[in-house]
């Protein structure tokens, strides 16, 4: 079985917030490496390249999107989901250390840690 790490960008069927539809989209793994190595699930946040609206305070830009395996500038949305690892279609890349730091900052703010 593939071992996923925090900060990996994966392609997954991600549910819409109303749970009525599912769309294949990139997501970033936010669960810890220890959790990922022992669990059948991973915890993810949605990634979007739809930059029409300004970035909200609980979102962060992926500055090094090419290292993340993304084709265009993207942001990490605040939509969090837990999915079975078997639903991962493929690993696209991983966040740079700068983008990982930005994600950790957003997680601390979003979850009041």
Q: Which residues fall in each region the model found?
A:
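Conserved functional hotspots at enzyme active or ligand-binding sites that engage polyanionic ligands
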Residues: 1-113
